[in-house]
Amino acid sequence: MNKILDQIRTEHPLVICYTNDVVKNFTANGLLSLGASPTMSEAPQEAEDFYPVAGSVLINIGTLTKHHEHAMLENAKIANETETPLVFDPVAVGASKYRKDFCKYFLKKIKPTVIKGNASEILALIDDTATMKGTDSADNLDVVDIAEKAYKEYQTAIILTGETDVIVQDNKVVKLSNGSHFLAKITGAGCLLGAVVGAFLFRNTHPSIETLIEAVSVYNIAAERAEQLSDSKGPGTFLTQFIDALYRIDSDAVAENCNLEEVK
């Protein structure tokens, strides 16, 4: 492990979050607990001031509207122009033609550093016939194949989330198997992960696969610890313990507990 978590705790990188209305509070609190500095900025008018000093930018389309379309594209354009790392989260992209059309257009105009989504979302980016319900992952999909095809099409790092997470970068593929079933029972779990990934980028527009492994593992191992601390009482208790676990987790715990399989 690169121990970038230690760097986050000492440098408190600024993560610009243009995220959806449902998860803003949860995302900000999660980043603060981790040690990062969130700013929930959406105005392109201030992007030229914020982005050059930011560690990364997250764009999450969860509550996409016509108003957000323009602002997201403008902000993403400025991120590319200022060489600020960009995490793109195409939430529920397969749920409607509107979302899919926007994401396809966005990815033609913009170069993300990382695309993060579940299997159904990543599949929808590479298969025009794919559909989905809400933000839930589809079952019985070849997640490694989907992630590799998305990587080849968009030439950017792919983080495909699910019961087993798949990361593709620099033609390397790994599977990660940490996490908690409670993550599927709280809203915004995947959305916060996108922001956490951003916290690990530190203005690196081509992060190593090791960096991405650490980011996802910190998140998932914190979730495992939260489940243990909450004594499986339920999602509400887990949610509180998860924020605490992000605050408490350290690099040694991540290195010791990371459940990783190198696919290629």
UniProtKB/Swiss-Prot annotation:
Similarity remark: Belongs to the Thz kinase family.
Q: List the keywords (alphabetical).
A: ATP-binding, Kinase, Magnesium, Metal-binding, Nucleotide-binding, Thiamine biosynthesis, Transferase
InterPro entries attached here?
Answer: Hyethyz_kinase (IPR000417), Ribokinase-like (IPR029056)
Q: Which HAMAP family match?
A: Thz_kinase
Q: Which Gene Ontology MF annotations are present?
A: ATP binding; hydroxyethylthiazole kinase activity; magnesium ion binding
Q: Which organism is this entry from?
A: Staphylococcus carnosus (strain TM300)
The gene from which this protein is expressed is thiM
The protein's name in its UniProt record: Hydroxyethylthiazole kinase
The enzyme's main class, written as a single word, is transferase
What is this protein for, i.e. what is its function? Catalyzes the phosphorylation of the hydroxyl group of 4-methyl-5-beta-hydroxyethylthiazole (THZ).
